[in-house]
Amino acid sequence: MAGSADELVSLLDLETLEVDLYRGAQARTERQRVFGGQVAAQAVVAATRSVESRFVLHSLHSYFLRPGDTTVPIVYDVERIRDGRSFVTRRVSARQHGRPIYYMTANFQVPEPGLEHQDRMPEVPSPEQGMPLVELARSRGPEAAEHWEREWAALD
């Protein structure tokens, strides 16, 4: 779908209101509540903007507290918990109507070699070899495809 990537990029390009305070735009949607992945992604962007570029996201913990309102922008307040040489910690509060809808604690680390704590990824077909989601929706009928295009095309 033309413009979908641009729409996603603009959704993740938060407006800076003040130091460590950002406003996130809302996606065009027919849903009654904000998609949780949107809130989490915008919170990661807000936290990332408060750390030096040498740090990468290492871990995060999220708490979805209330449903988000799709008609109102979300304000992200970043709190700088810790600034170390190797690790940085941020807490992000996403707010609407003066109340928190989401909390996230994110840890960033300077990349370094270390122990591997997981198995290697098994050999699987590449994404290009899989069926595009829009085709899967079309296989379920024109209404499903139309709904998918409206709501999710920017994320595909």
Locate the predicted segments by residue.
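Terminal targeting signals and extreme-terminal segments of soluble enzymes
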Residues: 1-156
